[in-house]
Amino acid sequence: MSLVRTRFAPSPTGYLHIGGARTALFNWLFARKMGGTFILRIEDTDNARNTEEATRAIFTGMEWLGLDWDEGPMKGGDCGPYFQSQRNDIYDAYFKKLQDAGRVYEDEGAWRFRFDRSKPVTFHDLICGNITIDYRDASNTPDMAIRRADGSYIFHFVNVVDDIEMKMTHVIRGEDHIMNTPKHIQLFEAFGVTPPVFAHMPLILNQDGSKMSKRDVGAALGTYPEEGFLPEGVMNFLALLGWSPKDDTEIFSPQELIGRFSLEAVNHSAAKFDITKCRWVNQQHIIALPAEEFALRARPFCLKAGLPDSPILDAAIATVQTKVQTLAEVPDKIRFFFDLGMDPEAVSKVQPEALELLFKLADRLEQEPEWDGHELIGVLKAFAKENGVKMGAVMFPARVALTGLSGGPDLSSVFSLLGREETVRRIRSFSLD
């Protein structure tokens, strides 16, 4: 078998959609699994809609996601150029081949490809199975235009020519292209080339079953870095949109995905996009990070949110590693370490009789010979017992007084990072007003 070659061929007419990112991922995973080559090709033949900003967004999105390409823009390769707008001489040569073979004809200035109508077109799809489409009736399947009256070439033609020139062995794309495949197969055969193997992935739908559009929440890949998602978390989630392993495992590193991915395990039915599931998957990857790495990744979000570059910042970040689903949630979770505010709802849950307990607790903490967060939890337990109350009657008011919140990091960490003086000051300053 020849070396596997796959490609991602986006059009730079808008931001990188989550569906396009999944297409790129499945092509990348298959190439990496098979020890093959992954190619990035920019299909920029729509001059009216192409933008440099969209092209940059494609590069940025793929680099962020970790989808490195072996050939393509900025990498080069033997089959370039990798922008379709720079390949017109190649297209002209292939168009002439069709002219010489009598397979094209002019129609009001445009040029159409003459289908072979002697038999239906049948092909085997690695995901969808055997597919047959009957092209014998010209009224149902008119000959397709491949060149416009202005001389520019249409998607179907350039797509096939590039796949031939770039020696593609597998074309992995969305199932919305299934009806294009027989057209493309006829072009391959007209050039005397064996078509690549096709695999059409299921569509991505919203939870209500509607087709996901560019305006839907989570549709734009570019929003994920801004919202604090990890690239490995998003990659993991995208892989589960249509593919599943043979067991119940859901969390995979990129290398684990490469090892377990197969096109045969891609589902036939449509995938449902669930942003809640995406956040959960991302949280599992956050929890799995070494503490130092988590702090390194969360730090820019904290500084951007106005938190000080304090000596305790990294330690404060570490206190919420198991409590956030995205990095963007970190600043608000730890802001109290640096700027104490009070959540009115949390304060309203503190009983008036707790104030006297808190003042006594402040005196007790001030006199503790050693200041160790874990040991101080034991002090609170003893204090509660001495005063004839349950632990919660001490812990909750203390948490609100120290953090302004009803939930958050372990109190042992709060004690340790605030220190004795600030802890005592906050407890004594707390009021229900």
Swiss-Prot record:
Domain of life of the native organism: Bacteria
Family: Belongs to the class-I aminoacyl-tRNA synthetase family. Glutamate--tRNA ligase type 1 subfamily.
Keywords: Aminoacyl-tRNA synthetase, ATP-binding, Cytoplasm, Ligase, Nucleotide-binding, Protein biosynthesis
Oligomer and partners: Monomer.
UniProt record, GO biological process: glutamyl-tRNA aminoacylation
Subcellular location: Cytoplasm
Broadest EC class assigned to this enzyme: ligase
Function, in words: Catalyzes the attachment of glutamate to tRNA(Glu) in a two-step reaction: glutamate is first activated by ATP to form Glu-AMP and then transferred to the acceptor end of tRNA(Glu).
One annotated GO molecular function: zinc ion binding
Motif stretch ('HIGH' region): 10-20
Entry protein name: Glutamate--tRNA ligase
Predominant subcellular localization, coarse grouping: cytoplasm
A GO cellular-component term linked to this record: cytosol
EC number(s) given by UniProt: 6.1.1.17
Catalysis: reaction(s): tRNA(Glu) + L-glutamate + ATP = L-glutamyl-tRNA(Glu) + AMP + diphosphate
Motif stretch ('KMSKS' region): 211-215
Signal sequence bounds: none
Entry keyword annotation includes Protein biosynthesis: yes
InterPro entries for this protein: aa-tRNA-synth_I_cd-bd, aa-tRNA-synth_I_codon-bd_sub2, aa-tRNA-synth_I_CS, aa_tRNA-synth_I_cd-bd_sf, Glu-tRNA-ligase_bac/mito, Glu/Gln-tRNA-synth, Glu/Gln-tRNA-synth_Ib_cat-dom, GluQ/Sye
PANTHER family from the UniProt entry: GLUTAMATE--TRNA LIGASE, GLUTAMATE--TRNA LIGASE, MITOCHONDRIAL-RELATED
Positions of ATP binding: K214
